[in-house]
Amino acid sequence: MHEHIICDITPPKLAATGVEGDEIDICNCWQINYGQKTSALKYKLNQADIAIREIQDMVAAGGRTVVELTCGGLKPRPGSLADISRATGAHIVMGCGHYVHDFQDKRNHTRTVDDFAAEMIGQVLEGAWDTNIRAGIIGEIGCQAPWTELERRVMQGALIAQQETGAAINVHPGRHEDQPQEVADFFLSCGAPMNRLVLSHIDRTIFDEGRLLKLADTGCVIEFDLFGMEQSYYPHSDIDMPNDAIRLRLLRKLIENGHLEQIVISHDICHRTRLIRYGGHGYQHILRNVIPMMRRRGYSEAEIDTIMVETPKRLLTFV
């Protein structure tokens, strides 16, 4: 429930240099992934022809729907998503709203909560990014650790938009282990429906079972969305990135404690090096590799169906 097909997530400081760096190929993709080489091209998913082939691979593996959460600050292109959907037969559900503070348009700094809310309501009900293509989910709404005042205003606007449209909200929390809980507590304090809140990137943020279960007890949906990132190296903070086996072990702990219906999984592909054609695993990885692993590790077909079909279907239904 969290991918990017067309986006540009180039860090602002790197973008300001104007340097694109090396072309990505099979010989340097791992050096780029481990930070030994820098290539701004890593952060650009802007090749519609490549995207079509990558999504076709997912469809061939049995996938039917992609939740595409490229939002304000990441250069969304709704028209390209529509073209890719038509070319592949895949359903693409588009997000809306704004990413973290540093990526946002400077004009956002003076905007009000009501202004952000009206924008997101319009993106869901009428069309987003100067098109008539409507968003089907709000997000990924970005926040950093610590949370900035601008990000809080966007989040408050997203809550109003949720109330008006019935769409679910996906939040990108900061990388501090306390921030997912901070976001969940904020939603609780606002009286928001917790089963309509998806907290992304939990598999790079929370590694303690007690902390994970406390978060789940709020009723939010917990998203492990970095499946396929198997290396322990993580450039953004000093953590040991879990592999897919550890992800499945933590999800089993959630299930054992009654939280099966609060789990969604994905890849969050936002780097070119994670595409098959640049040496990566692609959008088909969960279908071809993770689900067979789940079966080998004792996940029932009913559990897999809940995670892969029923919970996403519930979240993508407006209420």
Please provide the spans of the model-predicted regions.
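Acidic (Asp/Glu)-rich catalytic clusters
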Residues: 56-60, 81-89, 124-133, 160-163, ...
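Divalent metal-coordination and catalytic microenvironments
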Residues: 2, 66, 98, 162, ...
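Active-site gating/metal-coordination segments in enzymes
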Residues: 65, 83-86, 91-165, 221, ...
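Catalytic pocket-lining loop regions of alpha/beta-barrel enzymes
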Residues: 159, 163-253, 263
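Short acidic/histidine-rich active-site segments
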Residues: 170-172, 224-226, 258-280
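Alpha-helical scaffold segments that flank or form the walls of functional sites
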Residues: 1, 14-70, 74-88, 116-133
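Active-site beta-loop-alpha junctions enriched in small/polar residues
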Residues: 4-6, 71-72, 97-101, 140-143, ...
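Mid-to-C-terminal alpha-helical segments outside catalytic/metal-binding sites
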Residues: 285-319
